[in-house]
Amino acid sequence: MEEQFILRVPPSVSERIDRLLSEDASTSDEIPLDLFFSEDGRNGTFMIGNDEFPASLLDLPAVVESFKTYDDCALVKTADIGQMIMVREPGDPAPNTVEYRHGLTPPMKDARKRRFRREPDLNPELVQRVERDLLNILSGGTVENVSFSFYFRHMMCLYLLLGFSNFIYLNFFWCRYMSKRNQLRTRMLVMQVRKYLLLHLHLLKSLKLLRQALVIQQELNRREVNQKILMIQCEFIII
């Protein structure tokens, strides 16, 4: 495999390069064509003849495969291209980031925004809390400062989402291209999942009543009650 890159130059420079490639080798050797980079490896200078142009090394949003042929019939892959050297006019501004927004073809215009999945907006404090609780569970401890009402509300939202996804699942797979055997398997699977969700929802309602009964007793504080409730829920999930 070779190491290759895309060289994008202004129209005036591309015309000069085309003339150099079309001329004889002896004439083209007299005109220097070189590229220099600074210490950071991202900014450099493109030289053609006595003229210098600023250049930047950018990362493409997708990998482009490069092929070559000797007989105009068989293609041989030579490299995976993921970077581009953009040569610009001396007065043009430099790019703000090293990640180029667009691809090489018109369908890949603004690919990083239109085709890439956005990073989830997570609260750093929530992430640290989940990591800390996970380490406590793995070490044999319990989750701290858990509100049962908070857990109950989020579990209800989760069930609603699962119910909607099951509806989409049925409408997507129960089509004429699906065999009767697969339809039967799908119905059995959905019935088992629905039965499990209803049983889990009934258990949560029972645990809510159990928590209210345990809080009334004076010998148990709120933290001990939450720990007992979570232990019962974990045992049910494992079963």
Swiss-Prot record:
Signal peptide: none annotated. The keyword Transcription applies. PANTHER family: TATA-BOX BINDING PROTEIN ASSOCIATED FACTOR 7, TRANSCRIPTION INITIATION FACTOR TFIID 55 KD SUBUNIT-RELATED. Induction: Up-regulated by heat shock. GO terms for biological process: transcription initiation at RNA polymerase II promoter. It comes from Arabidopsis thaliana. This is Transcription initiation factor TFIID subunit 7. InterPro entries: TAF7, TAFII55_prot_cons_reg. It is found in: Nucleus. GO terms for cellular component: transcription factor TFIID complex. Component of the TFIID complex. TFIID is composed of TATA binding protein (TBP) and a number of TBP-associated factors (TAFs) whose MWs range from 14-217 kDa. Interacts with TAF1. Expressed in roots, leaves and inflorescences.
